[in-house]
């Protein structure tokens, strides 16, 4: 029987555990009914458990509390009833808890647990006890709120918030008390503002903590989460006041809206105002009260509002305390005394210093000086005339002269006139300034009246009332008899004011200037003639060292040979010369790899003077070797003896300069390929500037590129003046050698240096496509040219980096021949490989001119592909097919070394009857290019190079063209027309049919923000359009008319008929 009872007890215990597991599962899923846990715990604590009725209490509880569960599920968190019943009721008194509810029971259990009165067995059978409950908090936009909850005897603790079935982001921690073995759960929830904003239920957003154990679930008190904010603007800011000393004042401030209510604080000069720091100031809610303002209260006052969301400070209010002036006591009477006269009468004075006027306070009323009726008047030379008149007692009126008027204009008789008036005055006293001036001058005899009048500030011209003020009047019946002396003075005109008998033209001055000019011109001419004569007296300056007489160079018996075997070394000679300009290291380039047994021709370069006017035909050249092979050389480091600094403007054809003013102008080189456009009014009014434009060869400037893949793709351009900031951007047009510019990263390099400086500091000014609002330049990149808009001139060049594999650049070949005697069977042919720059031919021609060479011809421009392949050059006879060609390969790396005058040399047999063909290319022979050298070019006669035309175009103020030869070869809108167009297109429109659409139509809108930063965006766009539309000097007027017509069509497409009418009306039908 005992065994049966024991088995029954075990089964009952198992059923109880299964029931607890079921209850825990239901509670987690949200379907747990609100049970009477006190009755449940009392039933479980009975001494005897009937195995057949062990489930009865649970069944009864489930049935009786089902309706309560539905009722509680219908209520949402955040309602007022929820705050009253936040814990389940516990009804049995046998559990050790009172029947008053969960709040009281939990409080008793917490006290017993903390005091240690609760045994471990009793603790294991209790509901969870909250040690930390969440409290109401505020959440800010950028700072979330944190809620904490901690409970003992719990298996799990989570937060549940309004309007959400999922708990907020939380972190959980579990602890076990080492003394009691009680499990403790702690959870920290992070509440972001987004979660609060998403709640649209009734009442505020609330969160509560739920703790579960084997006995059931307990809810903590609800914590309210509010959104804290503070607005930016104050509802009322303090206003500035100007008050008299001792008056009462109030400053009012109403803080901006916010939650929680912002706390208001007053500040004086940014220091917080407290009752201790400012005893005379009372601070109340939003009001700052001054019982009696004092001078120490003058300050800047502001108020600040602060809450958990932030802090706001109002605008400052200035409190100005002014002081009205007060008179001091009268001084003792003293005698009236004038210089050289006995004393007569008395006077006394007082001072406006009790107190002195401060901060704009009123001056003291009334006179400063009192005089007796018989006070002696000083002579005329020390009389004082003031705007207030003279001080006269009320019993007697006295007359005084006013100040003299200004001298009149010279009459036809060369006479000037000035006048004065006899004035009288009533009760008005003399001003303090005039009296003080009179006191100072009493003892100074001989002081003129004009000085005293100037000190008193009397007007010179006007009626007596205007001179003396409103209180002055002229006594009826009295005239000039009251005043001694005359009222008019006349004088003869002085200086150059009188033009009687003088001619309009001063011949003496102009004859003197003409004489001085003639003397200076004669002196300058004599100096130039002497300088040229000194150069010609020594013919050895124009001779090579190899042809000088042995007597002139004693000790030099024979000239040493200078040979270099290309197979032995690939480095070229780096001739050292003190006058030669070079950059160490980077300018030394490797030579081309030639055939076996090949020697390179080197020349004894003649000593050249700095003056290039001497005939080049007198130069003598010796060959050091004669072979039938070819070689390559880098002539950028040739040993030209340029003693001193060679002026680029004198030594190069690639330069032009002009004195320009506000009318603007253009400077052109190489037929307009290189252009500097100075718009109208880019130079200040009444200012003229020496503007120059020149190309620098590679000898003069080398650009250190940032990366190995960077290529110098334009000539180095120097423009001046470099230290002048133009009023408007000028435009520089530079040709480049890029094929398909969109395949390259293009950069503009700039250096603020003179053209003859040895050390040039280059910097990257603009990277096309990477401009910012602070970029000082605008770059318009086109297929063949780059247009740069800038306000600062200096050195400019274009550097590019490839975007794709194997891009191409434009290059060409130039052929030159060495002058040799007709008896010589061999002739020398040098072929230069250069980039397609405008001055490439001039650079090579200058080198050849010094070596005695002549120009034979050039190839067409070809695309050199960056594919690491060498450039093969082959020279053959055009008439004899069987003749073996001369062939040479120039290494790929030598071509890309940024060296514009790399060349190879061929030594050929002279055959006057045969022409030559030069084949060149990188790939197979099918892709070779060919150009011919006529037979007569090899005969030895030098071909004159085509002269380079440098054009300077100037425009007058009305937009007319000054140079008649260039009247219609470029586009230029008159200034008046351009001004009207800018007035119509500069104002922005909602439909954007303004300067922005014009830039888009003219394809200049790549970086439109540059134009937006200028005073007139339309003017800059039109200036760039004019520069792009400029044609070469030889073009006809039809192309100019077509350009203007294209602009009219553009404006018509924009729908701006008003702008089109402006052009037609101001320019006329000439353009149309």
Curated annotation (Swiss-Prot):
Residues 31-440 are extracellular. It comes from the Eukaryota. SMART domains: DEATH, IG, IGc2, TSP1, ZU5. Residues 77-100 are annotated as: Disordered. GO terms for molecular function: netrin receptor activity involved in chemorepulsion. Residues 980-1067 form the Death domain. Prior to gastrulation, it is strongly expressed in the presumptive mesoderm. Mesodermal expression begins to fade during stages 13-14, persisting only in the cells that form the dorsal vessel. Expressed within the CNS from late stage 13, shortly after the first axons have extended. Detected in several dispersed clusters of cells within the CNS, increasing in number as development proceeds. Also expressed in the peripheral and exit glia, which migrate laterally out of the CNS between stages 14 and 17. Residues 324-379, 398-499 form the TSP type-1 domain. Its main location: membrane. InterPro entries: DEATH-like_dom_sf, Death_dom, Ig-like_dom, Ig-like_dom_sf, Ig-like_fold, Ig_sub, Ig_sub2, TSP1_rpt. It is found in: Membrane. Residues 1-30 form the signal peptide. The chain crosses the membrane at residues 441-461. Disulfide bonds join 149-207, 253-303, 336-375, 338-378, 352-364. This is Netrin receptor unc-5.
């Amino acid at each position: 029987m005992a065994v049966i009872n024991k088995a029954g007890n075990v089964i009952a215990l198992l059923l109880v555990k299964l029931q607890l597991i079921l209850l825990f599962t239901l509670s987690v899923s949200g379907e747990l009914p609100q049970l009477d846990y006190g009755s449940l715990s009392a039933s479980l604590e009975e001494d005897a458990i009937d195995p057949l009725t062990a489930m009865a209490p649970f069944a009864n509880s489930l049935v009786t509390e089902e309706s309560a569960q539905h009722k509680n599920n219908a209520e949402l968190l955040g309602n007022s009833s929820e705050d009253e019943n936040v814990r389940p009721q516990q009804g049995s008194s046998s559990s050790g808890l009172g029947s008053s509810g969960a709040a009281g029971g939990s409080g008793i259990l917490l006290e017993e647990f903390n005091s240690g009165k609760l045994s471990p067995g009793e603790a294991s059978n209790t509901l969870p006890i909250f040690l930390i409950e969440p409290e109401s908090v505020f959440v800010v936009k950028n700072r979330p709120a944190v809620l904490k909850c901690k409970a003992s005897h719990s298996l799990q603790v989570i937060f549940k918030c309004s309007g959400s079935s999922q708990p907020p982001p939380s972190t959980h921690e579990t602890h076990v008390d080492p003394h009691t073995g009680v499990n403790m759960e702690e959870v920290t929830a992070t509440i972001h503002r987004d979660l609060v904003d998403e709640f649209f239920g009734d009442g505020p957003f609330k969160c509560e903590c739920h703790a579960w154990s084997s006995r059931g679930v307990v809810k903590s008190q609800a914590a309210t989460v509010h959104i804290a904010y503070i607005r930016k603007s104050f509802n009322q800011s303090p206003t500035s006041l100007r008050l008299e000393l001792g008056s009462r004042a109030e400053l009012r401030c109403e803080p901006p809206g916010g939650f929680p209510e912002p706390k208001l604080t007053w500040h004086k000069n940014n220091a917080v105002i407290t009752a201790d720091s400012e005893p005379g100031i009372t601070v109340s809610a939003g009001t700052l009260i001054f019982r009696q303002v004092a001078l120490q209260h003058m300050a800047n006052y502001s108020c600040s509002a602060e809450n958990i969301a932030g802090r706001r400070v109002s605008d400052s209010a200035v409190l100005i305390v002014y002081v009205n002036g007060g008179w001091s006591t009268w001084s003792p009477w003293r005698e009236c005394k004038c210089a050289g006269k006995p004393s007569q009468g008395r006077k006394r004075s007082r001072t406006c210093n009790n107190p002195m006027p401060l901060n704009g306070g009123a001056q003291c009323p009334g006179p400063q000086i009192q005089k007796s009726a018989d006070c002696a008047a000083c002579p005329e030379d020390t009389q004082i005339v003031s705007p207030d008149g003279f001080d006269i007692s009320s019993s007697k009126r006295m007359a005084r002269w006013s100040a003299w008027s200004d001298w009149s204009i010279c009459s036809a008789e060369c006479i000037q006139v000035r006048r004065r008036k006899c004035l009288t005055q009533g009760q008005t006293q003399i001003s303090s300034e005039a009296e003080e001036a009179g006191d100072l001058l009493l003892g100074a005899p001989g002081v003129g009246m004009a000085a005293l009048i100037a000190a008193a500030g009397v007007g010179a011209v006007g009626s007596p009332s205007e001179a003396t003020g409103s209180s002055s009047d002229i006594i009826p019946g009295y005239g000039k008899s009251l005043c001694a002396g005359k009222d008019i003075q006349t004088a003869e005109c002085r200086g150059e004011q009188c033009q009687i008998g003088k001619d309009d033209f001063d011949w003496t001055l102009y004859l003197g200037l003409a004489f001085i000019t003639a003397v200076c011109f004669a002196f300058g001419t004599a100096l130039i003639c002497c300088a040229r004569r000194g150069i010609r007296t020594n013919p050895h300056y124009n001779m090579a060292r190899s042809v000088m007489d042995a007597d002139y160079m004693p000790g030099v018996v024979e000239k040493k040979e200078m040979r270099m075997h290309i197979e032995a070394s690939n480095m070229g000679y780096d001739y050292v010369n003190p006058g030669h300009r070079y950059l160490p290291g980077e300018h030394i380039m490797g030579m081309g790899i030639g055939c076996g047994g090949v020697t390179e021709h080197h020349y004894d370069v003649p000593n050249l003077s700095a003056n290039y006017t001497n005939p080049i035909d007198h130069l003598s050249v010796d060959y050091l070797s004669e072979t039938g092979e070819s070689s390559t050389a880098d002539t950028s480091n040739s040993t030209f003896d340029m003693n001193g600094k060679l002026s680029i403007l004198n030594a190069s054809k690639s330069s032009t300069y002009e004195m320009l003013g506000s009318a603007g102008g253009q400077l052109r080189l190489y037929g307009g390929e290189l252009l500097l456009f100075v718009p109208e009014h880019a130079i200040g009014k009444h200012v003229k500037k020496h503007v120059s434009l020149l190309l620098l060869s590679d000898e003069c400037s080398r650009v250190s590129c940032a990366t190995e893949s960077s290529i110098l793709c334009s000539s180095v351009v120097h423009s001046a003046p470099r230290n002048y900031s133009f009023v408007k951007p000028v435009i520089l047009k530079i040709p480049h050698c890029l094929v398909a510019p969109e395949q390259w990263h293009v950069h503009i390099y700039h250096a603020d240096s003179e053209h003859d400086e040895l050390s040039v500091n280059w910097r990257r000014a603009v990277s096309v496509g990477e401009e910012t609002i602070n970029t000082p330049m605008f770059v318009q990149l086109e297929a063949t040219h780059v247009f740069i808009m800038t306000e600062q001139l200096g050195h400019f060049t274009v550097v590019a980096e490839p975007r794709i594999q194997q891009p191409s650049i434009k290059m060409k070949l130039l052929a030159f021949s060495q002058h040799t005697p007709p008896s010589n069977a061999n002739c020398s042919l040098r072929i230069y490989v250069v980039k397609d720059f405008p001055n490439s031919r001039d650079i090579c021609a200058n080198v050849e001119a010094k070596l005695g060479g002549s120009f034979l011809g050039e190839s067409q421009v070809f695309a050199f592909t960056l594919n690491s392949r060498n450039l093969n050059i082959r020279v053959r006879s055009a008439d004899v097919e069987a003749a073996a060609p001369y062939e040479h390969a120039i290494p790929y790396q030598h071509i890309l070394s940024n060296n514009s005058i790399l060349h190879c040399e061929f030594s050929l047999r002279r055959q006057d009857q045969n022409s030559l063909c030069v084949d060149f290319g990188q790939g197979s022979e099918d892709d070779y290019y060919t150009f011919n050298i006529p037979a007569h070019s090899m005969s030895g006669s030098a071909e004159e190079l085509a002269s380079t035309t440098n054009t300077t175009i100037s425009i007058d103020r009305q937009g007319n063209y000054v140079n008649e030869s260039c009247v219609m070869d470029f586009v230029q809108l008159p200034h008046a027309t351009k001004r009207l167009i800018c007035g119509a297109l500069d104002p922005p429109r909602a439909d954007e049919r303004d300067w922005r659409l014009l830039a888009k139509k003219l394809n200049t809108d790549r970086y439109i923000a540059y134009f937006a930063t200028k005073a007139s965006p339309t003017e800059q766009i039109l200036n760039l359009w004019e520069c792009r539309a400029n044609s070469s000097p030889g073009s006809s007027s039809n192309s100019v008319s077509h350009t203007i017509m294209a602009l009219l069509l553009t404006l018509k497409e924009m729908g701006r008929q008003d702008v089109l009418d402006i052009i037609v009306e101001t320019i006329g039908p000439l353009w149309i």
